[in-house]
Amino acid sequence: MLMSLTNEQQERFQILLQQLQIPDDLINQYLQGGGIERLVIDKANKSWHFDLQVPRILPTELYELLETKLKQSFSHIARTTFALETENKQFTEEEVRAYWPLCTERITFSPMFAYLKKQLPQVNGVKLLINVNNELESTALKKNVAKPVGDQYEVFGFPRFQLDTHIQQNTEEMQKFREQTQQEDRERVIQAMEEMAKKQAEESSVVYEGPITLGYLIKPDEEITPMREIQDEERRKTVQGYVFHVETKELRSGRTLLTLKITDYTDSIMIKMFSRDKEDIPMLQSLKKGMWVKARGSVQNDTFVRDLVMIANDINEITGPSRKDKAPEGEKRVELHLHTPMSQMDAVTPVSKLVAQAGKWGHEAIAVTDHAVAQSFPEAYSAGKKAGVKVIYGVEANLVNDGVPIAYNEAHRLLAEETYVVFDVETTGLSAVYDTVIELAAVKVKGGEIIDRFESFANPHQPLSATIIELTGITDDMLTDAPEVDEVFKKFEEWMGDHTLVAHNASFDMGFINVGFKKAGLEKTNNPVIDTLELARFLFPEMKNHRLNTMCKKLDIELTQHHRAIYDTEATGYLLVKMLKDVIEKGFEYHDQLNDSMGQGDAYKRGRPSHMTLLATSDVGLKNLYKLVSYSHLNYFYRVPRVPRSLLKKYREGILVGTACDKGEVFEAMMQKAPEEVEEIAQFYDYIEVMPPEVLRHLVERELVRDEGQLKTIISNLVKLGETLDKPVVATGNVHYLDPEDAMYRKILVSSQGGANPLNRHSLPPVHFRTTDEMLECFSFLGEDKAKEVVVTNTQKIASLIGDVHPVKDDLYTPKIEGADDETRDMSYKMARSIYGEELPEIVEARLEKELKSIIGHGFAVIYLISHKLVKKSLVDGYLVGSRGSVGSSFVATMMEITEVNPLPPHYVCPKCKQSEFFNDGSVGSGFDLPDKECPACNIPYVKDGHDIPFETFLGFKGDKVPDIDLNFSGEYQPRAHNYTKVLFGEDYVYRAGTIGTVAEKTAYGYVKGYANDHNLTIRNAEIDRLVAGCTGVKRTTGQHPGGIIVVPDYMDIFDFSPIQYPADSIGAEWRTTHFDFHSIHDNLLKLDILGHDDPTVIRMLQDLSGIDPKTIPTDDPEVMKIFSGPESLGVTEEQINCKTGTLGIPEFGTKFVRQMLEETKPTTFSELVQISGLSHGTDVWLGNANELIYNGTCTLSEVIGCRDDIMVYLIYQGLDPSLAFKIMESVRKGKGVPEEWEEDMKNNNVPGWYIDSCKKIKYMFPKAHAAAYVLMAVRIAYFKVHFALLFYAAYFTVRADDFDVEAMAKGSASIRARIDEIAQKGLDAAPKEKSLLTVLEMTLEMCERGYSFQKVDLYRSHATEFIIDGDTLIPPFNAVPGLGTNAALSIVEARKNGDFLSKEDLQQRSKVSKTIIEYLDSQGCLGDLPDQNQLSLF
């Protein structure tokens, strides 16, 4: 009986699901709202039984996953079982039938009932109907099976079923009846599908225009309930919000269900509405994401989604609120400091939306300044052109000094003889200007000893903050009777004399000294100074930090009470003594030598980076900016990419330098240093940035600034500084997202990084994109005129200094190779004439000329020539190359040996006299399928070739599409092919194609749930979905394309196109990558796809073993073709190898999915195999499409649409214009279907209705050239499997297999079958390694059943990594041993070169393998009679 779940039961269920690691999408879809009704623990039998309640019947896959995970998770505690109770008892016949195999597996019954497993029950209400042959069977079944079946289905969550039987009629008559009814069913289905397609087409053509009003109009004054206030079921509520998800679904009843998810940014809610009549449907379908709606209805607990949902009666489209920039035209601000999702895990709004918003507000320009990167530039460039907004390209970079001085006021004084005044100050804050000293202490050090002390409190005449009291231990009471600050400084000045001053972080302490001296009427001190912090960084660069307490611990110096001046001073004195000894030993004898190493080596690591803004004013500046970004990532990366000041000076041309945010050195100096110091620092910059006080409020929170009043004073002083230095002061927003309500996305992202992100140490300020009037309000404290100057006038002025900058080129820049056009033409014609004769057939010459005109005319010849060189090098080195993608559509590529696929129509050609015969009527699918035929003139066999593939599928209808030549090199050869590009072009002209890894939806879901848990929030599912969407797409890391090589022409350099970096900032990686995602520069630079693949490696090994040139292998061998429909040509039966085909281990045809396709289609020709390859790689091409057409007898395998090119070729043969045929092919392959007007053209040219319907279903299609190349490799490998079996298995196990069970393999078929059964019985419980092993064992069984066998691993004959043929057996390599990796395997082989092993001990010592491996080899008899230890001799 269904019970009402408590919150605790639901929460425990969610915890259980998380522990079981059930994917979040499955939980959300099927298990949300479920619970644990009870848990029954049987301690005696060590068993746990869970009674679980779930919303509805689960898919069988999910049921089995739950079962598997429960067993795995509690295997060490108890045996687990569970039963399901479903809240919604509705089920379909398909669901009942899906569970039938599980049911029959779990019931123990007599073998007489085994036939139950081979049939599926019919379902009638709660009755299951089973076919039986007679009354006796019926009685036995009801008596013995009915109850366990009912019990088992109840466990699955179904209602209790009754078992009924149906006695079959005469089998032959029954079969005829079935066939007749099946045929009628098929015809009805086809008719229904055609009618449905027609109906859908008619309905989809109706588009509703105008404001949408579903139901009644909702009055403007009706009370709106904020969504956050909806916490329970309500009878009638009205909400309004932004639509962020829309879905419409046609129900079986004929009604349409609309599902919306909307937000008012206080929360989100799902809204459901059912159509009332046909007139509703166009309006339902016209609701789109991005609209604002008002909805009225009842709020209910939805049992399906397990959440509060509004069932709407009325939905009205409304105009949503939006921020407007109210400033007059021409008086609008320019944002000069803005971050995009390319600021790693920090900003959330896509740059295209930000630029578009600037355009809507009438802003003339907008700057992009991500943290240290330029990766948003390409998207920003496109967005700027679209919105008519000037985009200013910049970076917020990390500036470091080339080296921070160790010594100031340098003097020629002997370090060993000097007297040092080591001092420390405790203060009310960090600012020498706004804060004051409360304690000043010092010691004099000479000859390694403390010779005098100075200590005094100072009265600040203000209460201390709690933070200062806690940090220093100094209280207000301790300062009440202290001397005045001026008095303390005067005494100290007299006491210190002209000795060398020493402090830990001297720039901070000296700031207070100099300001204190000035206020006391004293001169600024010119005493020499040593900074022990920088001295420590110089002497101990390997340490992560050099704080005083850290250094004291390292050098064993006592630090009694850190952050009390006198104790810190004494500790610093002893630290100085020890470090001076080290520095003198390094050869530094005088004070004025201490800075001699400044800026050398990794000095850039020792400074603390300051932010600065860099804006490119021209293309020259952009190139320099790319260099700065590149070198900061390549040469100066330490925790973050750093820009040394000297590097910026070198590449400053065309760049404006701004002071950036509160992390910039000018703002920090204004907070902490004397005005003259600030002026000196600010001289380096071109303009000064100020930000709204609320953007900087975290400084007050962190007590770096006393209050908002002081913060405004600092901003005002920055404005005055600009006036003093005649530098423009600009108001910037430090934008990280578009609207205020987007702040939550950033909070979640920052929170996900925990303590690693310093932003988690304070609340995040509001950093949305502000309008002009919002920004003017922020700076109103400056006065109206000054506010307008910094917000509008000066930002426009900076924008006016920026010229026309182009971060992305408009053209393709290919490498130039002298004579490439002629060489491409000559090479193509030379090869063509060598095959087809000096007088080329018209069809050949026309195709060559057509292609060469496009290739040479558009500057693509060099791309072909480079690809030719790469392939040629691989072929010379002994490795075949497979082509991918559509390059096989190009006959020029075939003639240049870039691909083996010949795209001409199927044909014969005589290898001697060159006579040819072409079949260009579509009657033959592939030249390889033509019957053998001899040349009548020469009486020698014709060569057969041609796959009938149009050139247009490669370079487009106009032949102007940039060639994308993908090549499959051997996996073991791929690194050599990559490095060969460096030989061809030079190391500075080839780069790996960069990639950018962003936050995926599933990861974002984890962030949102984590944030909710950390902040004790209960969030509705709809709100979770909104937050997840807002967090996706933000940059997490960078990487590299597995095979993409970007080539820069030698007349340009990479910085003309993109910055460069190491992948994932992995310093010292073998390859540098493009900084931009390679898609951004795809149309500007040549990208070579040099991919690694197993097939060429297998072919190379087979060639080495057999001596057979793979190119000479026939492609129509009858025995080879047979394996695609059965295993008989291998000399085994289906029963022997548990497989209905012979394609185990054949690339592209060995997977269960494709083997099932082969069983259903029984291909017999090469072209049909190409069809299978295309069908298996497409989306919605086979399942629910071609397979049904073949099953229904509508058409044959060769007639269905298998590859994209088939569409164009077929339609041309049917009479359609080639241009239209190409457009239809492109539309279908992209999943866009066939527009109505094109459908009419197809019908007018007798294209059958089933063909058109099939086109409409397709979402993605495979290129025929790719399929043909794959099949060619597969057929060659299959040839070895049929005719040179042991060679095939040796190559397969060496190259493709990863997991082995050498013990079972060596014992033969029975042992292998037992191991297969053992793994198979585990089902989903099987570990990933076991699943991988299962494939290997299937191959092993097949090999053994063909009469071959495995030996044990042999200590003296086994290879490290390759299976060795020995008669009719294979000797496994060492790395087939469990736990023995390739390096250890090589170590054994290397060790045995030095002579036989004396003992197991000797083997372990010489090979360095583990004792466990030795014991395993011994247990398998691999070590023979090798003794345990070396025998000792007495003489």
From Swiss-Prot:
CDD domains linked: DEDDh, PHP_PolIIIA_POLC, polC_OBF
GO CC field: cytoplasm
Localization terms from the record: Cytoplasm
Example GO biological process: DNA-templated DNA replication
Domain Exonuclease: 420-576
Catalytic activity field: DNA(n) + a 2'-deoxyribonucleoside 5'-triphosphate = DNA(n+1) + diphosphate
Bilayer-spanning residue ranges: none
InterPro entries to which the protein is assigned, alphabetical: DNA_pol3_alpha_NTPase_dom, DNA_pol3_finger, DNA_PolC-like_N_II, DNA_PolC-type_N_I, DnaE2/DnaE/PolC, DNAPol_HHH, DnaQ, Exonuclease_RNaseT/DNA_pol3
UniProt keyword annotations, A-Z: Cytoplasm, DNA replication, DNA-directed DNA polymerase, Exonuclease, Hydrolase, Nuclease, Nucleotidyltransferase, Transferase
Main location: cytoplasm
Molecular functions per Gene Ontology: 3'-5' exonuclease activity; DNA binding; DNA-directed DNA polymerase activity
SMART domains named among the record's database cross-references: EXOIII, POLIIIAc
Matches recorded under Gene3D superfamilies: 1.10.150.870, 3.30.1900.20, 6.10.140.1510, Metal-dependent hydrolases, Nucleic acid-binding proteins, PolC, middle finger domain, Ribonuclease H-like superfamily/Ribonuclease H
Enzyme Commission number(s): 2.7.7.7
Family: Belongs to the DNA polymerase type-C family. PolC subfamily.
Function: Required for replicative DNA synthesis. This DNA polymerase also exhibits 3' to 5' exonuclease activity.
PANTHER family the UniProt entry points to: DNA POLYMERASE III POLC-TYPE, DNA POLYMERASE III SUBUNIT ALPHA
Protein name: DNA polymerase III PolC-type
